[in-house]
Design a protein with these regions (language model features):
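Phosphopantetheine carrier-protein modules
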Residues: 12-31, 48-59
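Conserved alpha-helix in the HATPase_c
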Residues: 39
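C-terminal structural segments of small proteins and small subunits
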Residues: 49-75
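Thiotemplate assembly-line natural product biosynthesis machinery
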Residues: 1-18, 71-76
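Short linear motifs centered on Gly/Pro in flexible linkers and helix caps
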Residues: 7, 32, 61-64
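Two-component histidine kinase catalytic core, primarily the HATPase_c
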Residues: 36
């Protein structure tokens, strides 16, 4: 799950793969803006056939937060 999410994320950021860790933060470390995040979330919802609630995004700061959130919803 982690590698799949990172693979999707790499389409939205200009950061080398080796600099991305589970603790990498979307805003502070990757400098993603809200449009990037919402577009990425939409793609992940399609790929994982799961809804990521907008209000839940306030609690998803790191890549690991997103992995945990999606894993919980898709049962992985």
């Amino acid at each position: 799950m982690y590698e799949k999410i990172v693979g999707i994320l790499l389409d939205y950021v200009e950061v080398p793969r080796e600099e991305i860790t589970p603790e990498t933060r979307f805003l502070a470390d990757l400098k993603m803006n809200s449009l990037d995040i919402m577009t990425m979330v939409g793609e992940m919802e399609e790929i994982f056939d799961s809804t990521i609630e907008t209000e839940d995004l306030n609690e998803i700061w790191t890549i690991q937060d997103l992995v945990d959130y999606i894993s919980e919803r898709v049962g992985e």
